[in-house]
Structure formats: structure tokens, C-alpha cells
């Protein structure tokens, strides 16, 4: 060390020498400045290397390295408070587990924060703007909502008499509670009485040092006994003073004022109304959700006021992944004392989290690529291999989406597996995570294939599904029998290795730990897989500090029961909790810049269709498909070997084959920008899941639907199935099929439903319009398409904004034998659809048509209203006829 310090002194001396020379020899100013600059840069580089690489660096950082400082009675081994209460009662059986939120506007901040909290905890809710008429509150003999929330308490207090009486009656009859937030105001109130209640408020106060009422029956998730020291956020707090035994404080705080005595009684910031005054239980908040403790108290209030219907589980499972083991530049890797600290911290956490082990993700190629001291750290990890759990990262830390050759990908995985075997690392965890989550989502099929073949992977995780932000919307899915779990971030990244360089400083990190984002992530998610990196465990060891601190803080302030399990068990438990998430929803990779960076460069969103012909069946979709294919600027998908021209991706098992499979039907072309790709699948129209799936992948696609008389469509479908040899259709008359009861044999009911359900046009269109704006929907009159396809196609081109327009008049001609228009070939002949199209069937019986008129009456009436709402200037003639008493001849 003496030699290095002397070298630094020599550098300083050199600077002096250069300066002297400039003075003595009267060198030009430019040369002097250049020389001084070069020496300065050299000194900086030398000093940087000296500080980072020398033994002195560990001494420097050890002085600043943060240590967990969370202290509370629970961690000191004091007597634990009684276990969390069970809020369940028989009253919960009369209400649905749903919250009704009254907001001032749809864009108000607190209302949005309430909704986000509910979404994060997967609590169903409905938002209503206060001041309007009340929504329907009951369904038969059951209440639709378990709790009512008023973003602004005044909106409840000032509600008109009729609605207030109606709302209060509902609350009393179904034992439904109310949560209200006192709004901030420009005018400061002192001792103002709440309208109609023996409760008084003081507003616009600054407060500090919050505490909870340990005797409150509301506290379940939240643990009392501690003090949240320091000023509370904002200077517009409301405190409550009661004049009735129905009120009991839930939380207190003190005035944050120099002229206010600190020994005075604390002030109630959250108060419970037990319902002894007017028969309705309430919880009133004197501040919004900026204070982290209020978020916990709101969740507990929902649980209590709903009689347990909205209670959250208190079990939380945690897994901490350490990516990039053996990967990293020199000076960022682990040394022996870092590994010892890792083991010591793991042991302390195990006392708080049963089963906890750090989960190490390794890339074997970079083993022993550090300094001599860091290589000893690598060795020490392997000496303690049994004390951790392990997973394969990637042999060379390369992103899987960069591999176009699956064989090459498998070979690299095999190298990592062989490294594991050579060094005694377990290879049977069934878990893996790729570098930067590449290939997990958006899916790179080669990764899933290689994972199965080499590692028999059964579970992975990613932060990218459906998107990184907002974190509350991260979900899981299953693809190729591999469970993909949501992965959480903790505020630490590969470059955050020193506390003094942490963005926002230590205060920012502590804010996340002590009630902030990291704390809330664990509170809101029953299963937490966290991403960290090897570099976070060296130098200042920020990951050790972060996780030990947040776990202790959770123990201090919540009744959560923390535990840990291997990834496979976490995956199984996750999909037991959320089975509805097993089916993926494929999004558009080009709508997320992060997704584009981990998507193969050989793929392009220009391969996706610009518009969809969605059906329904037997309305002329095949004819439209044929006519569109004539257009020189329009291209359809390649035909499917199983379903002919229809891919049927969004509504069937093909969806699980993934985006790569779908895009393979739209081969890339040099003229992508000028080409209009489309897909036609007539089964999409009435598919319950199709609109959501289609919108996730193709949010800007145009939708084309063709509507015919639903009665005629039903009859045509029946005849279609007869021609194709359906035994049910051949054994039952059309009238028997459409009038079949719900007790009829299942095959008969299935045929009935396929005849009748697609004709409920308004119902299906409304589902599409809940995802797509009306401007992206074009409705074609099926009769007009049949009688005047040229004009119909010209209107469609205008809707699609295809220029220049293609003149169909010289490419379509009416064929009297077929009874419809056909394509004109180069030889001036007509090329018509096959024998299965345009068949002539016996006329429908009058009794069947009359039945269908009655059956579709409400649906057709709704369709007329919908068409008018969409701005349609003309109502189709067939729709007018179906709504009259005229019997079809």
C-alpha cells in the first residue's frame, strides 16, 4: 500500500513538473493545457483503478456498507399479540365479494389509487361517479356489494334524500359497511360537525408519529404495537373527535408543530363507527392513501366491513433469485467474505422465513473469470453448494432469442448442465430463468423446446408478462406445460452495488423497504419471486441489506406468515390460487419497446393482419374472402391444412400453439408496408374469449362482420350440418332442433346452440365493442353483399383506406346458374365457389320462422338500437322484415 500511495504522490509531482516546465520554458498555452489534461486523465484512471482494485477498497466500502436497523418488539422476542382475528360471519353469505367505489370523477387521484389497490389485491370492484343515480344494489335476495367506498366523504353526507335513504337501507338490510375519506379543503375547519353525526373534525393539520389501536377488531393483516416515527405525508390531514360511544379510534398521530405540546393525547386520524348510532358500520379516514399504513388499514377495513368476504390470505411465499452467478466484471463479483455474509444473512432470514434459501442462477462459462480474490469467492460458493438452491441461467449468458438454431441453443444448455454435474450443482430443480427474461415472453419457441429437452424445465418466471409496468398487472401463464410465474423487482439492478450511488440515496431505498414499493409488493402478492443479481451481494451487499430489512419490517407491522418453497411448488400453488391465468393472452411485441429488444430480429409485426373478417358462419364470409383475394394489394393468410382458409387461432386449441405458429401463416414479404394482410375465421364472431385475445395482439386491426337474417342463418347452418352428415341434424327436423329444451340430449342441445347463439348479433357485437372502438368495426349487410358485391367492396375499401381503389366491376360477374356473383378469370370466364356454396334448400316451415321471429325479437330490437348508436343511416331490409309479423314465403 505504501508503494501505491507513493505512486500517487509521484503523479502529483509530475503535475508540478509539467507546470514548472510551462513556466520556465515559456511553452505555448495550448501545449501546456494539453499536457496538463493528459496527465490529469492518466492520474484519474490510475486512481480509479487503485481505489477499486486495491485491498483498501474493501476498507473504504465497509465503512459505508448499510446494515439492517429495523427494530421492534416482535423482533426483540417480546410477547406476541393475539393472532389475527377471523372476520367471517354469517352475514357474508348475503353479499358478493365486490366493492362499490364512488368517485368524484373518473380521473380523480384518490379514486385511481383506491382502484389500483383493489386491482393489486385482485378484489373485484365497480366505479360510479358520485351524484348520479345509484346502480342496482341487489340481485334477487343478495347484495351485489360487500363494502361501499366514498373517495370524498362529503359526497355521502350531502347525497340527496332519496338516494341516501336507499343506500342506508341497503347497508342496514345486508349489513354492508361504508369506508369514507375526508377530503382536503382550502378552508381550515376547527370543531366542525359532520352533517347528521355526533362527530367533529379539524382539518388541514400536519401530523407525525402514527400509532394503531391494538384493541381494534379491524386489525387483521396489520399488526399494532409500533410507532411510524416521523412526519406523515402532506399537510392537509383531518382528525376526528367523537361525542358518542359508537366511535373508536383505529389510528392516532400527534401534531407536527413546534408550538404543540408533545405530551398531549394523540389525535384520531382513522376512526371506526361501530354502527350503534344509526345501524351502519363505517371506517373514516382523515387522509388519503399517500401514507403507506392507510393502504393496509383499508384492506383490513374491507375485510372487517364485508364480514370476511373480502379477507385476504395472510400467507406469503418468498423466493429470492440471484441471477448471473459467476458472471460479472472484475471488482463486481463475490469474494470469500461476501459469500460468508450471504450464508450468515440466509441463516438469519431462515429464522423468520421457514425454508428460505437463496436461489442461485449460474452461467458456468464465466467461472473463475474474476480477480484471484473473486475466484476464491467462486470456489467458496461451490464449497457450500448444498446450502443454496440452484438453477441454470445460460452457459454463456446469451439471450435465447438470438439463437435461430435450436440445436445450438441445446448445445449451450448442455454445456451448463455438464458444468453443474462436474461441480456437484443439483440439476433437478425444474426451474430456469433466461438472461434478461429473453424468450420467456414474448415467447421464443426454441427456448421452451430446448428447456424441455435438456433440463426438463417445468417452471420459469418473468417480469415481462404482460408488461413490466404497472407491476400490479403482472400475471402468470402456462405454455408447453411450463408454468411461467410473475417475477418481481426489488429496486436493485446489476449496476446498483454501492449505497452512495443508489438513485435517490439510501433514503430512497429505505422508503421502498419501510412501507414503500418493495414492502407493498410482498404484502399484495401471495407468491413473490424476486430478481436480484450476483453484483448486488458484493461490495456494499445491498441485496442482503434490502431483504433482511424488509422481512423484519413485515414482521413488525403485519401478521403475515412468511415462508419459502422450491420454484416447482410455488408454481403449483400459484395456479391453484389463480387457475384462470393458466391460459396465456398473447400481446403484440411491437407495442412494448422492452419486448422488441428480446424478440427475434427475424420477426416483424408487419406479418400480422391489418383486418379480420370475423363472421359469423353462413353469412357469406367465404365469398367475401374470395373477392378480397382478387385485390392486388390485399393478401390473406396461407391456408391451414386442417381448417382450409381459416386459421381459427383466437377461438380454439390453435391459440395455445403460440404467436410464432400464427405468424407462420403470414410469410414475410418485401412490400410489407403496402400490403394489406387479413385473416378470415367465421367462428370468431361469437367466441367468448376471441375479442379479448384479438385485441391483445391486434389492437389496431379493423373488424369486418357480415349480418344476415338470424333466422335464415340458423336454417342455413342446420342444412349445412345435414349435408356434412351430422347424425343429429339427419335425425331431427329443424323445428325439433331449434325448440329443443335444456333437458334434451347434449348433442341435440349443442346443435341447437350452434344454430341459435351466433344470431344474437347485438350481444356479440357489444362484446367486441367492449375492446375495440366503433371506428374499427365495419358491418356488411349480407343481402347487399349477395346482390351488389361491387358496391359493397368499394365501401369496404373506403373503410380500410386502401388507395388506389380497386375496380371490382370488371372482375365480378353474376352467374345465373349459381345464383350469385363469381370471379371473372383472364379467359373471360367465371370462377365460382365450390358445390358446397350457394346450395338451394327446401323453404323453412312457417312455424319455425314464426318461432325464430319471437326468439330473436329482443335481440333484433337491440341490434336496431346498436346500429343507430353506431351511426348507421339505413337499417337492413331483412332486419325490418324480421321485426314485422310478415311470414316468410
Label for each model-derived stretch:
Residues 1-29, 58-70:
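Short, low-complexity, Lys/Arg-enriched N-terminal segments of secretory-pathway carbohydrate enzymes
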Residues 153, 172-174, 182-192, 326-330, ...:
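Metal-dependent polysaccharide deacetylase catalytic core of the NodB/CE4 family, i.e.
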Residues 297-319, 337-368, 385-387, 406, ...:
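C-terminal domain-boundary segment and adjacent tail
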